[in-house]
Amino acid sequence: MEEIVNTDLGSYLRQMRERVRPEQMGLQARGSRRVPGLRREEVAALAGVSQTYYTRLEQAQTAHASPQVLLSIARALQLSADERDYLLKIGTPVQNPQQPAPHDDQVSPSTRMLLGSLGNVAAAVLNYRCDILGWNSLYHRLFAPHLGFDAPERPEQRPNVIKMNFLDDNVRSLYADWAAESESNVTYLRFISGDHRHDPQLAELIGELTIQSEEFAALWCRQRVSNCIEGSKLFDHPVVGELELMYQSADLQDGNILKFYHAEPDSPHEAALQLLMVDLDSVHHH
């Protein structure tokens, strides 16, 4: 079964090789270098594989390699843990690839109760494609008050975090550093594509974003990967102004992801978040 999400091992190796400076590896920059980064023979030597074999991998004459070889190449290219995991995924054949099992895009009743009970935390349930399957009032108020609260429950118009980031000006203007936010969106999408190379809906999402956003297309081509599970973001919110929030992600039993945003206790940011909740309550009572 063919892979429909393009996760090209050869071009990924080439981009990672071009990123490494010879000096980082203790290599003399001997002679004039026509191209950035390490030469193929240098990577092969550092990884302990033949230059011919490494070249075949990079030129896609060999589609896969053993995990041991891939780990050696990852060390030679100084890949991060997330980049190494991605390399192992795209460089190893999928065992007995099946049509992807239909993913359950429903939020369980207990998870829905949990969402509702997280009062001072903005929380949402996402699938791996970053479609929003459910959110609590605060998440809705923080990110998408211009959409109906029931939008996640309607599959045909379900909001997608990455599409909103690139294609919805209301959301785009929320981030104090939109460039950093969009880069982390794309590096995450690239990371999870290693696990879901046969998913037509993921391929469709990537295709749609590539056509509709030049910025997305440029970032996607860079092939950077990271599994963005926690960190902090600075918002410039139209209702409460500047807001710095920490975020974390947790895997749910059904394969979906619980994403939540919270402020540092007793900080001005917590006060701003509470103001957003008060504003919310006043809206509910009118």
Predicted regions and their residues:
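A short, Lys/Arg-rich alpha-helix, primarily the initiator
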Residues: 1-38
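Short amphipathic recognition helices of helix-turn-helix/homeodomain-type DNA-binding modules
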Residues: 2-9, 13-14, 67-71, 75-106
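Amphipathic, well-packed alpha-helical segments that form the structural scaffold of globular domains
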Residues: 14-21, 88, 92, 116, ...
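An N-terminal domain-cap segment
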Residues: 24-38, 96-117
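Recognition helix of helix-turn-helix/homeodomain-like DNA-binding domains
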Residues: 30-34, 40-41, 47-64, 74
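Hydrophobic protein-protein interaction segments
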Residues: 109-127, 133-286
